[in-house]
Amino acid sequence: IEEISELIQKGQAKKVVKLVNEALEAGFPATDILNQGLLKGMDAIGVKFKNEEVFVPEVLVAARAMNKGIEILKPYLQDTEHQSKGTVILGTVKGDLHDIGKNLVKIMLEGKGLEVVDLGVDVDAQKFVEEAKIHQAQIICCSALLTTTMPEMKKVVDLVAQEHLNVKVMIGGAPVNQDYCNEIGADYYTDDATRSE
């Protein structure tokens, strides 16, 4: 299982698949393979990314390897106590077409066992709120990389309040900071994908 974690960090998807299958055959519980192998490896990559020891391409390759492993485990996990820890609605706000930061956040959140509904880019406030209702989400996560699109985040916060939704709003992106988060009344601010946990 330790080896699976190391292979995730190297992004070696084929070897991950082989070892996950071997671990299952050897009788290791699927939840252990997931938590101590796949997720542990992704966590380690998250820390390295935060410390600038690895960069976006390495994170994406590791995520691909992790997802291949998760695909094999899925049928086994559905039979066990591995339940989703919650649902997050994720998207880049209206007028903003940047998605690399959002995609990293998605990977990190899924790695924590959260269900992520990715709405993509250029998402208006109404859409965030509608999807949160449909999926009974606990968190709406908005990303913006342009100062001009930041006000869209406030629209999301205001609409959540207006609709009396029991949903937390998390914001992130290059121009955003904790002061802005406080100013618009959002619940959480994250300055990088790895801290989105």
Describe each PLM feature range.
Residues 1-80:
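Long amphipathic alpha-helical segments
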Residues 187-193:
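Short acidic-hydrophobic, aromatic-tinged amphipathic segments that line or gate anion-handling sites
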Residues 77-94:
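Glycine/charge-rich, flexible interdomain linkers and switch-proximal surface loops
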Residues 83, 101-103, 110:
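Cytosolic, long alpha-helical scaffolding segments
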Residues 105-112, 117-186:
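Cofactor-cradling patches in redox/metallo enzymes
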